[in-house]
Amino acid sequence: MRRRRIAAYAAGHSCVDVYQGAVAALVPFLVSERAYGYAAASGIVLAASLLSSVVQPLFGALADRRTVPWLIPLSTAAAGLGIALVGADAGYAATVAAVALSGLGVAAYRPAAARLVRTAADGPGHTAMSWFALGGNIGFACAPLLVVGALSVSGPAGWWLLAAPAALGVVLNLPRPGRERAAGPRAAASPGAPGHEDRRAFMRLSLVAVVRSVAFIGLSTFIALYVRERGGGGTAGALALFALFAGSAGGTLLGARLAARRGRVATVRRAYAAAAPAVLGVVCLPLPLVYVCAALAAAALYVPFSLQVTLGQDYLPTRMGTASGVTLGLTVSVGGLASPFIGALADATSVRTALLPLTVLPLLAWALARRLPEPVPGA
């Protein structure tokens, strides 16, 4: 594994995914400062997710067919610019459009970057992909701190501070001579993959990833509001969101280690089984324990994350960009499509009641994952 290159990809991923985390971190601000209802605020999450859901596989297919070195830095800039433009406060429609621009940037970045990571990796690639995913998770975890820090600065300057990670990410993601040639269209097959496509397994894996996405994005969107509803303040809500994102970072690295010992599919199944009681604890246990359960739930839900990306690439070994666009992109973004429904239920009842359906989703993901095959290199 080319460690320096993977580290650069991971750092660049952090600078992009901080903006997907920022969308969730902005929800409490939009509710309190702009008087949005829960359903309206969750519609902001939908704006970032809906566009991503449609276009990520298209960007993945583009990356499979041709080398597009400009796409990664340009998408990084779009992700940051969109979030910064939320501060213009030109009305709900303009806010939705700004967040959609950010979502488009994230959507364009992920498939192309994930494909570069896999071609730069040695062996099965799940260790390299776990570090790449960790970079994204660090960005997620830092998002609440970035939002709180930037919005503590009065005026437009605070909002433009939100674009600082994107500026760094553009520098990190600038094309390097030889990097894109090594990962060009002729290098589409994953290392050691036989070239046989298992579309049925890929579809089942995609369903697993969708269920996981609904559970995690539902928690990340509403956990800060949930903590406030339980009597915590704004800082307590940000702490809960930080615990969730920090747990996801730990789970990503743990997934690679467990997969090396027990196999990817077995690790995915056990992680979802472990996630079920943790998500239940977030909803049912007293407030101090919510932070612990949030971290545990996120860790268990993120153990499968990078493993599902490499499984998808091995199920479709000649179309890594497309596979990444689905497993790393589309299925993750689809989780945001459920947010307005959760928000509408929260408006009608309470945030706690709205989160209750999420407790069964890890068990559903576990049941779907039971029939996933473990790819055998060279078979």
Predicted segments, located by residue:
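Extracytoplasmic gate region of multi-pass secondary transporters
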Residues: V23-A24, R200-A243, A249-G250
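Conserved MFS/SLC helix-loop-helix module at the cytosolic interface between two early adjacent transmembrane helices
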Residues: V54-A90
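Helix-to-loop junctions at the C-terminal end of transmembrane segments
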Residues: V55-T67, G251-G263, A346-D347
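Structural signature of the two symmetry-related core transmembrane helices
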Residues: W70-A84, A266-L280, T359
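Cytoplasmic helix-loop-helix junction between adjacent transmembrane helices
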Residues: A98-G135
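Helix-loop-helix hairpin linking two adjacent transmembrane segments in secondary transporters
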Residues: F132-G178
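C-terminal transmembrane helical hairpin of 12-TM major facilitator-type secondary transporters
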Residues: V265-Q308
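A late C-terminal transmembrane helix in Major Facilitator Superfamily
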Residues: Y315-T349, L358
